[in-house]
Amino acid sequence: MLIIVACQFIAPKVGVASPLILLVVGLAIGFLPQVEAIEIEPHIILEVVLPPLLFSAAVRMPTMDFRREMQAVAMLAIPLVFLSAFAVGFVINWLVPAISLPWGVALGAVLSPTDAVAISIAKRSGVSHRIITVLEGEGLFNDATSLVLLSAAMSAGLAADEHALNPGLLIGKVAIALGIAAGIGWVVGEVGVRLRALIKEPSADTVFSFAMPFIASVPAEHLGGSGLVAAVVAGLVVSRRRAAMISAANRRFSQQNWQTMTLVLESGIFLTMGLQAFGIVEETAAFSGGLAFAAFLAVALGALIMIIRAVFIAIMLAWLDHRRTHRQRRYEVENSRIARFEKRMNAACEVDADMLQARDLSPEHWENALNHYRRRLKRRARRNAMRGSDLDYFENEPLGPREGSVIVWAGMRGAITLAAAQTISTHAPMRALLLSIALFIAAGALVIQGLTLPGLIRIVKPKMATGDISEEERAKLLTVMGSALVDTALAQAIHEVDGQTLLSAGVSRTLSRMGHAVSADDEAAGMRIARTADRILTDILQDATTPDAASASETDDDARTTVDMSEEEVERSFTRDQIRELALEAIHAQRDALLQARDEGIFSSAALEGALARLDNEEILLVSSHGVDN
């Protein structure tokens, strides 16, 4: 633990990712004469460490962005893994005939999954959010694909049957494993998040969340599915449902504890990777050719994997661009269809009673039919609006050659490669050589690619994350959050009591919170946004005022819908519990509005996460103050 803390402390000072430092520290300790060869059971990493790590990453993944990048993620996680594995298998079988094709494919499957350390390095370099989403999505699923392929290849190798590597059979096995895992993960996620909604104690909720990845992965493995995919799917379900169903206090508490657990597990993986290196190297040195031959094969196969990845990603980006053009045309065609549908609906609304009578239709039946088509029109319009939001996202976050080069170079291998390699059967020919190749490629990729990735980003200059929310998006957020207040009891209270007095009396923090929810760090910008929030909220509440009240306010100041009250009078009008309930209702209404906007893809995930986090802060503050008052 102290080593992890020390590496975390040193990493930002030397400008190197902490996993790389931990790997070097592990290598240094492992090669000390006083330290014997260390071997850790690989199933501990694959079945105990990886499920919670992938579950945690899936929970942090914005589901809106994952949906948008699902095609790219699927291509990187399945076809690329198959291509890389079979290419490695054929090449090593050609270079080392003693290693049959099935065992070569097994090594290829081991070398296929990318490592999460690349994501932390890319994030720190400030690349666009879309690049991070693609890398994270690939890392969530390619582990499972490679492990399923590894199992099939080892079975073929033990049976000495190369025909068992028929691509059709392998694709079928992968599809079945993924299908079983997705079903179990979805059920565990849906049931688990509902159970967590019933748990009021944050500590108990966090403990239950720690168990969820294993509740998903263990049954999936026993039923022939992928336990890792089950944990990922459960995490994605939690990511989508938690804001609406789990209390803010529970979510915040579990998030902080998961960050600590993730740090310990990830750091432990890289430290143990370095510690195990000496034993693998010592075993390989006993074979003819020894380490030099293993290093040569590692360089050749590592270069082959990167070339395949570069070519595949270039083709994928061209295909994605073609798909974007096709979506644009489809969006425009659907827009014109919706416009024609609306014209026909407007004409249908003007049908008179004589025409209905001539067609033997009652007004009630006609109105029911119109309502049915209105609902259809609304659904089509929402789907097309989502398509338009996706197109805006693709335009603002492009994936061109510059971004593609970052995705290619960030595909480094790591601790998962070494753990998977150690599961290769002891009956495999030249097993020590296979393990050494995996070690050299994983360690070499982490060090070489990990250290040079920031430099590559500076050279190719891909689209970078701005970190700021545009004024237009802030205004739209404020409008959505303000509109959500119209039907709440808080809005009624604001009409009955002067809103400014409510603010100054501290009776309601909701109005000022609207500005803070999307405010910038700059104080001047924050004040400007707060004034915008006040103006937008005033307009919304005035629009919600009844026409009678509005006309009365124009003719008689005494008939206004709000009244002047002193702070003392306001505080006598509302108890603290009433104030708290008004504010909590407003928070829930605004959160629901933001989640609906998320489903429609209206805002960026960064803007939504910031606004939702501010609402969580306010809810936690209100709930905790209630406990203090009592």
Each predicted region: which residue ranges?
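Cytosolic C-terminal regulatory domains/tails of membrane transporters and channels
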Residues: 366-377, 461-630
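Transmembrane helical cores of multi-pass secondary ion antiporters/exchangers
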Residues: 1-477, 575, 589, 594-629
